[in-house]
Each structure stands twice: as structure tokens, then as C-alpha cells.
Regions:
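Beta1/beta-strand and adjacent pyrophosphate-binding region of the FAD-binding site
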Residues: 1-12
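Glycine-rich FAD pyrophosphate-binding loop
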Residues: 5, 21-45
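Short hydrophobic core segments
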Residues: 5-7, 30, 132, 145, ...
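An anion/pyrophosphate-binding glycine-rich loop and adjacent beta-alpha core
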Residues: 34-36, 41-42, 50, 56-57, ...
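Glycine-rich active-site loop/strand segments that organize a redox cofactor
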Residues: 47-95
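Feature captures the FAD/FMN-dependent oxidoreductase FAD-binding
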Residues: 75-156
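A glycine-rich dinucleotide-binding beta-alpha-beta segment and adjacent secondary-structure elements
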Residues: 127-130, 134, 307-387
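Glycine-rich loop(s) and the adjacent beta-strand/alpha-helix scaffold that form part
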Residues: 156-202
């Protein structure tokens, strides 16, 4: 019977441990925190966005950080395979807007508890509060793992330690150190799915304001580099929310270039053409012709956003509407569809939902998740140089790579 050690009890580690146990291996899951699945518990605002109902081509598209590496893993273990497995374990799921899949109970705790039950079923030994300090390699093959408490012999080790985001959940980049010690390359570690810091200070005046159904674009060198439609929010330092988090991957890449000049452009009324928006504004101005400008826009915008839009259009909010010129009205229209902020930086990696960068994929076989340098060493999940957008794509990547790594660790090329 093979002895397999899984390092890290996040989504990838839980899946790897369960599958290795199911396939007949003796499995030890080593977790440095006092519980497994800690970070999984905060995904989807504590509801656990397990996966997405999109097809696999869409998954690759929504994984800007080396998505093509996942083709093999998704062929072996797709979102449908994952849901079939979870349903067989008794978890009921539902699909929400954007194809996001959640447990029916809206409880991440239920997902974790089901994994704990299945780990027990397959006699997986779970060791909590036991960080791994090194991996032992002899003749280019894994032979053991050392923790701060014990030395373990093994036939295979699967690194599932996550990235460097949300360190309070245990993701502190330990896996990078372990992999580097045995000769692997670590690519540039940086935040992904992270809020954006802007140079403009007026954002503080509207911090907490959420906008829905807006179009947000990243612009550099006068070109739109990426755009997203949906929700966003102003904060004391800049911008956050689903659209912003997704765009942060592009912003991060641009920031690494020499002398980057990046702006974020918000279209507050993307459903309207410039002409239709102007007519809409004229209609409101006719209705409120005797009022001041600030009062004439209350049907169009959230109240606390109105002074900002007027200021950006370089107009006086107390000016009577019946004195507003056509040129001034068109300036307002322009700001409504081209509200521009300049990017200063991204928030730190500790605040990111996922980490971009990781163990270099050039050194791993995408069909097996086994190291090309060291036999019996595997990587799965966010510790690898993979990152995706929000919507269940990151968890699916973790589950799929964990599954593939476990299957090959147990069966080798015979599976």
C-alpha cells in the first residue's frame, strides 16, 4: 500500500487526500492551522462558491493566469464530475447568477464538514497544527516529509499549501519555500483579485458607495486593455467589487511594465448611447428647469455621487438648470460615461483573494501534476502559477488539480 502525504488542507488538499484514500493509499494530511478548509470557508462571502456551470472553454477564458495548463486536469475532472461527486456525498447545490454554484444551504461549513466525513470514511489521518518544514529527496525522488513534530516516510507528496493571500487562513507562501528548497523555480508572486488604489482623493467622499450595472475599463497607452460589466464599490483608497477584482489581473500585468500609465474608466450608463443619454439629461433638465444643477440629477444618479460628477465636469452645482448651456450638458454626459481615475497601485497580496505567480508550471506535467524534476512530488491548487477570476473558477482549478495529482500519485501511469 502506497503512503501519500498531502501538505495543506485547503480545497486542493482536501480533494487530493480524499481521492488518494478512496483509491487505496494510506494518506496523511498535514495542516499547519487548527482546522482544514479555512480559506474555502470565506469564498463567496462565507457561502462557498464551489464551481461554475460554464463549459470548460469558458473556464480557460476565465483563468488569465496560465489557464491553458488546466486543459488536461479539466478533461480528467470537470465541474460536472465535481458536482456528481459532491452530490454522491450528500451535498445539495444550486446555480445562481453568472453560473456560480453554491451549496443549497449557503454554508461553507457544510462543504467542509462533508469533506471531513469522507476523509474519515477513507481513513485519512488528519494532523492539525503541524507545519511541514522540508521535503526529503533521494536520487531525484521524494522519500519523506519533515514537520516540526515528526519525520514521515512516503512514496509521494502533494503540495497543496495555497498562495500568499489571506495569511490568517494559513496561506503564507510556505509551499513556495518547500518547492524552492528541492530545486523548483518560483515565479514572481503578486496579488490577483485585489482592490485597486487610485491617485484621486475624492473617492473618500463616497467610500462605501456601490454601483451596479456599470462598465469598467482599464486603459493604457490610449487603448482599452480589459473591460468588465457589473458591480463595483468606492473605498477610502480607491476601488473594489467584482468588476475591479477581475480587472486587477490586467492592472497588475501593466504595472510591471516600464513607466505604466493606467487609468480606470467607469461608464455609469453603459446601456445608453451618448445621444440617448443627452436626451435623457435634457428631459430631466426640462422637468427641474428652475432648480439648481445638483437637484436636477437626482433621478439619474445616487445622491452622493452627484457632486463628484458635477465637479469632474467642472461645473457649479448651484447653477440654475435653465442656465446650463448645451456644451456644459455634453460635458456632464461625457463624465457620466467616462468617469476616469488614475491607478496608483494594487493593494498588498495579503488582501488579495488569490495569488498570481507560484511554482513554475514549466516544471510540472499538466496531465499528472507531477514534478518533472522530482519523482513522486506533485503540486495542486493555488501554490502553482495559476489564477482565475471570481465565480468559482479558482476552487474548480484547486479541486481538479488535486484530483489529478492524487490519481497519479496512487496509480502512476497505469491509471
Amino acid at each position: 500500500m502506497k503512503q501519500i502525504i498531502v501538505i495543506g488542507g485547503g480545497a486542493a488538499g482536501l480533494m487530493a487526500a480524499v481521492i488518494a484514500g478512496r483509491e487505496g493509499a494510506r494518506v496523511i494530511l498535514l495542516e499547519k492551522m487548527n482546522m482544514v478548509g479555512k480559506k474555502m470557508g470565506i469564498t463567496g462571502k462565507g457561502r462557498c462558491n464551489i464551481t461554475n456551470s460554464a463549459d470548460m472553454a469558458e473556464f480557460i477564458k476565465n483563468t488569465p493566469g496560465n489557464g491553458k495548463f488546466l486543459y488536461g486536469a479539466y478533461e480528467r475532472f470537470s465541474n460536472e464530475d465535481l458536482l456528481d461527486l459532491l452530490h454522491s456525498w450528500g451535498l445539495k447545490t444550486k446555480v445562481e447568477r453568472g453560473g456560480r454554484v453554491f451549496p443549497e444551504s449557503d454554508s461553507a461549513l457544510e462543504v467542509r464538514n462533508i469533506f471531513m466525513k469522507i476523509l474519515k470514511k477513507y481513513n485519512v489521518q488528519v494532523h492539525l497544527n503541524e507545519p511541514v518544514t522540508s521535503i526529503t529527496v533521494q536520487e531525484n525522488r521524494v522519500v519523506g516529509v519533515t514537520t516540526d513534530k515528526e519525520q514521515y516516510a512516503c512514496d509521494a507528496a502533494i503540495i497543496c499549501t495555497g498562495g500568499a493571500s489571506y495569511p490568517l487562513t494559513g496561506s503564507t507562501g510556505d509551499g513556495y519555500v518547500l518547492a524552492e528548497k528541492v530545486g523548483h523555480t518560483i515565479t514572481d508572486i503578486r496579488p490577483s483579485l485585489v482592490p485597486i488604489v487610485t491617485n484621486e482623493t475624492w473617492v473618500k467622499e463616497i467610500m462605501g458607495l456601490s454601483l451596479r450595472n456599470v462598465e469598467v475599463s482599464v486603459i493604457s497607452k490610449s487603448k482599452v486593455q480589459a473591460k468588465q460589466f457589473g458591480e463595483m464599490m468606492f473605498t477610502h483608497f480607491g476601488l473594489t467589487g467584482p468588476t475591479i477584482l477581475s480587472l486587477s489581473h490586467t492592472v497588475g500585468k501593466l504595472l510591471r511594465k516600464k513607466n505604466p500609465q493606467i487609468t480606470i474608466e467607469i461608464n455609469l450608463k453603459p446601456a445608453l448611447t451618448a445621444e440617448v443619454l443627452d436626451k435623457r439629461l435634457q428631459k430631466d433638465f426640462d422637468l427641474y428647469s428652475k432648480k439648481q444643477l445638483a437637484n436636477g440629477m437626482k433621478d439619474l444618479l445616487p445622491v452622493n455621487l452627484i457632486p463628484i460628477v458635477i465637479k469632474l465636469a467642472e461645473l457649479d452645482s448651484t447653477k440654475p438648470i435653465n442656465q446650463i448651456t448645451k456644451e456644459e450638458r455634453l460635458r456632464l454626459c461625457h463624465v457620466l460615461q467616462h468617469m476616469t481615475l488614475t491607478v496608483k497601485e494594487l493593494r498588498p497580496v495579503a488582501e488579495a483573494i488569490v495569488t498570481a505567480g507560484g511554482i513554475s508550471l514549466k516544471e510540472f506535467n499538466p496531465k499528472t501534476m507531477e514534478s518533472k524534476l522530482i519523482g513522486g512530488l506533485y503540486g495542486a491548487g493555488e501554490v502553482l502559477d495559476i489564477d482565475a477570476f471570481t465565480g468559482g473558477y479558482n476552487l474548480q482549478a484547486a479541486f481538479s488539480t488535486g484530483y489529478v495529482a492524487a490519481m497519479h500519485a496512487v496509480h502512476g501511469d497505469e491509471e
